[in-house]
Amino acid sequence: MSPVKVFGHPMLTNVARVLLFLEEVGAEYELVPVDFVAGEHKRPQHVQLNPFAKMPGFQDGESLHIKSRAIAKYILRKYGGTAGLDLLGENSGIEELAMVDVWTEVEAQQYYPAISPVVFECIIIPFIIPGGGAAPNQTVVDESLERLRGVLGIYEARLEKSRYLAGDSISFADLNHIPFTFYFMTTPYAKVFDEYPKVKAWWEMLMARPAVQRVCKHMPTEFKLRARTRCLCTPRGCVPCRAGDDPTQEKRPPSRGWVIICPSTSSIPFQFQQHEESACASARASPDSLL
């Protein structure tokens, strides 16, 4: 059987979510790089995979899927039984299943809207404006942190009663928190979690999982302007870039290219080339397309 294909880049939170559940179930997969800042996700080839021109694209044989949380559920339903995992709670009682559904919705509707603006302001804006010329919008950060504290207070109360959000076993709901929280914990506001000891302990349990470590190992925490190399680092090793990505085979006008530093190998897996003002406008319009 051919491995499933994930189209995107492992630094993106939605791509990382899909990779995380593939790693949890031990499924074989191929990661196909997509240069999103160069606009490859808007080209016809990718739009055939994802009509909304977002990432990831996901292909399993002739079957195409979109939306990272839906893809993750597909992965668990197809491969979770073989791996002995019931992260969706579908083999448990109706109450357990309901709790997984509830906290999955809480993550998407309450937690994500509170935490993502902080990540965007502290990581994305400085990343796409060369030289660090764009300071975070402190009003947005402060308002988001206030909202996040309200959510974390509810989480703290919940985790005083159970080991994980949906009960005493880890679930789909818990693991969906990984991508954005990972980046949040690299910001100056990570200490907010120290105010909620049960939440902090829960987060540390999640980060201790081998699958989580394999995926987060390739989610960069350092962004620098460097020369380009020819590999894409993934949880399954380095994937050579396509010939078209080889600067020796492609003539381009001089431009500043921002790259991400793979923390595990110190190699440079990707380059982004776009005028900073255009990139900033695009990011503000659709921040989820960047992380």
Curated annotation (Swiss-Prot):
- List residues of the GST C-terminal domain: 93-223
The record's section on Pfam families has:
GST_C (PF00043), GST_N (PF02798)
Residues holding glutathione: H41, K42, K54, M55, K67, S68
Q: Which family does it belong to?
A: Belongs to the GST superfamily. Phi family.
What Gene3D superfamilies has UniProt attached to this entry? 1.20.1050.10, Glutaredoxin
What's the top EC group for this one?
transferase
The disulfide bonds in this chain are none
Give a yes or no for keyword Transferase in this entry. Answer: yes
Q: Which GO terms describe its molecular function?
A: glutathione binding; glutathione transferase activity
What function does this protein fulfil?
Answer: Conjugation of reduced glutathione to a wide number of exogenous and endogenous hydrophobic electrophiles.
* GO cellular component terms, semicolon-separated: cytoplasm
The catalytic activity, as recorded, is: RX + glutathione = an S-substituted glutathione + a halide anion + H(+)
Q: Where is the GST N-terminal domain?
A: 2-83
Q: What name does the UniProt record give this protein?
A: Glutathione S-transferase 2
User: PROSITE patterns from the entry?
Assistant: GST_CTER (PS50405), GST_NTER (PS50404)
Q: What EC identifiers does the entry list? A: 2.5.1.18
